[in-house]
Amino acid sequence: MGLFNRSMKVSASGIFRGRTEWHCHVLPGVDDGFQEMEDSLAALAMYEEIGVREVWLTPHIMEDIPNRTAALKQRFTELTMAYKGSLILHLASENMLDGLFDERLEAGDLLPLSDKRLLVETSYFSPPFDMDNTLNTIKSKGFFPVLAHPERYMYMDKKRYEQLKGMDIEFQLNIPSLTGAYGPEAKVRAEHLLEAGMYNCSGTDLHRLSSLEHLLKADIKKTILHQIP
């Protein structure tokens, strides 16, 4: 058993070499993530050190954090002017499926990932009203929904995951889930989804520099490293 379940430190695993970070809150001063430019630059430097190649900055947009597109673009410009490293930086957003999102979607006021892929999230504990209809509306507008960290949604089960994949919804893995950062249940869900090949991309969902430091010190199963998209 030990042979097939051995773990290693994330820092020694090499999983970030050449990787694209698809989900983080490193853009400073716009949500519950990084607040100071200095800390954001330190996080980008750490990404470089561990081998990350591209970073998508995905600040929250929700009713409680109603970021405006123009303001986010301005802050992104300020960060790119201050940053002197080799990472390729992109701006997108993580969109809560709520009333504000419905308004922004109707207006076409969105910040998608590459290829019109739109990072979306829900409450961890209950689904939004008429979720499937909202996802279908996103697709009807020419976007492709990417569900952030599905392993963290306690209201979802295997059947629901399969339904969403049947709707061509992409899944984004939070890599810290595989180390137990969000508790044992999210870890088990993440491992099952990974083994089932349901994830399309991954990220750290980084909100604090200390979280990346803790992630690098954490243990991860060797047997799942090659499955991380």
Regions found by a protein language model. Give the residues of each.
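Non-catalytic positions within long, well-ordered alpha-helices that form the structural scaffold/packing
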Residues: 48, 139, 194-195
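Mid-to-C-terminal alpha-helical segments outside catalytic/metal-binding sites
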Residues: 5, 216-229
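An N-terminally biased module of ancient metal coordination in phosphate/nucleic-acid-related enzymes
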Residues: 1-86
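Active-site environment of divalent metal-dependent phosphoester hydrolases
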Residues: 62-65, 96-98, 151-156, 178-181, ...
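Hydrophobic faces of well-ordered beta-strands that scaffold small-molecule active sites
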Residues: 20-26, 55-57, 89-93, 118-122, ...
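Short acidic/histidine-rich active-site segments
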Residues: 198-214
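Extended substrate/RNA-proximal surfaces in nucleic-acid metabolism proteins
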Residues: 2, 68-168
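A general structural detector for well-ordered alpha-helical segments in enzyme core domains, enriched
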Residues: 39-43, 75-79, 134, 160, ...
